[in-house]
């Protein structure tokens, strides 16, 4: 992760000022057994209006059920889940619209009374992406007329207590016409602009953002101990996609140096997801098999901007080892609602910054 330190400190201070009180009780019982993956379908066709449409099918069982929106996001180290951008939530059992209520204390928690005999819930809602210029990670500006970065934590509600490593979902994505996409997720099928991915755990889904754009180009950078490494670049124009020979050589050297430094790899493949646009928030956010990297629109064609921005790629890819493969205990929480403890954040970020620059 790279951003302004003051923003991170502010988030930590706000987290410490949370109102005390007890969470409204939903009857605690074992989660409904998953006989098949939950499904999540995201429609990106109105990304130019900063609007996503979401459909979820979740397992359910009779009684009061709690659904939660991811709050503490890995790599952001703070309770920054963009709950304020969720809108128009409707929950149905079949064709029956069910009333729901917000928890009186925890605004990331929703309660719904599930009728007898109901085994699944159908949810629909919208995600309103912030306008250009809005800072933040998954709460920052992520869409323009020509491109979008989807962080799955933006568009998820899951049963409370769902284990990230075992709760399974089948994701799909409806793209605008003629757009391309890049992600660490494995594609199962594609029909025109509808992309279906193989089922994955909740943990892997949130750890696998999608870069989509009309102008998108993928370039192979080499291998790290047998695993292919590539970079996907999305931009507002074709001209801004172009990687110079010097930049390409630097990226290839980065892959080779990391292979030599760490001596092994823990991913099946790795892809830099690089957005070059003045319409999105600028930062880097690490993931296990990819990184969400965002730079100014001319970052690849302006030599000064290019030199300043290339260090971001080294920082975020090092995080795949230091921060993802191995994570400080206080940041390895059991789910996305449990608070993180940042007492070892200096190792997570400090060592990564050093190695990334080297």
Predicted regions and their residues:
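An active-site-proximal "capping" alpha-helix that borders the catalytic cofactor pocket
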Residues: 258, 347-357
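Non-catalytic architectural context of zinc metalloproteases
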Residues: 45, 57, 74, 79-267, ...
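Residue-level detector of short, conserved catalytic/binding motifs and their immediate flanks
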Residues: 54, 87, 121, 169, ...
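Positively charged n-region of N-terminal signal peptides that target proteins for export
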Residues: 1-4
């Amino acid at each position: 992760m790279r951003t302004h330190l003051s923003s991170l400190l502010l988030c930590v201070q706000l987290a410490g000022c949370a109102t005390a009180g007890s969470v409204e009780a939903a009857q605690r019982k074992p989660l409904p057994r998953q006989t098949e993956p939950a499904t999540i379908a995201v429609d990106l066709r109105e990304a130019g209006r900063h609007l996503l449409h979401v459909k979820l099918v979740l397992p359910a069982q009779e009684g009061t059920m709690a659904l939660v929106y991811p709050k503490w996001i890995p790599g952001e180290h703070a309770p920054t889940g963009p709950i304020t951008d969720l809108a128009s939530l409707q929950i149905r059992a079949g064709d029956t619209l069910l009333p729901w209520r917000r928890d009186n204390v925890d605004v990331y928690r929703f309660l719904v009374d599930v009728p007898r005999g109901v085994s699944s819930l159908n949810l629909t809602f919208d995600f309103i992406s912030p306008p250009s210029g809005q800072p933040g990670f998954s709460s920052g500006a992520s869409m323009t007329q020509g491109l979008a970065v989807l962080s799955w934590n933006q568009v998820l509600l899951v049963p409370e207590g769902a284990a990230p490593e075992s709760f399974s979902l089948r994701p799909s994505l409806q793209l605008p016409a003629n757009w391309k996409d890049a992600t660490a997720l494995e594609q199962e099928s594609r029909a025109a602009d509808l992309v279906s991915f193989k089922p994955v755990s909740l943990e892997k889904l949130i750890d696998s953002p999608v870069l989509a754009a009309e102008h998108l180009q993928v370039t192979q950078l080499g291998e790290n101990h047998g695993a292919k490494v590539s970079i996907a670049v999305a931009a507002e124009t074709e001209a801004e996609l172009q990687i110079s020979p010097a930049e390409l050589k630097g990226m290839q050297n980065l892959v080779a140096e990391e292979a030599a430094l760490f001596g092994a790899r823990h991913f099946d493949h790795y892809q830099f997801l690089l957005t070059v646009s003045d319409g999105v928030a600028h930062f880097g956010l690490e993931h296990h098999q990819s990184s969400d990297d965002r730079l100014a629109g001319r970052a690849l064609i302006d030599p000064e901007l290019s030199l300043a921005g290339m260090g971001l790629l080294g920082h975020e890819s090092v995080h795949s080892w230091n921060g993802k493969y191995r994570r400080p205990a206080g940041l390895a929480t059991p789910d996305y609602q449990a608070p993180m403890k940042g007492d070892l954040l200096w190792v997570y970020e400090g060592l990564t910054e050093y190695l990334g620059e080297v």
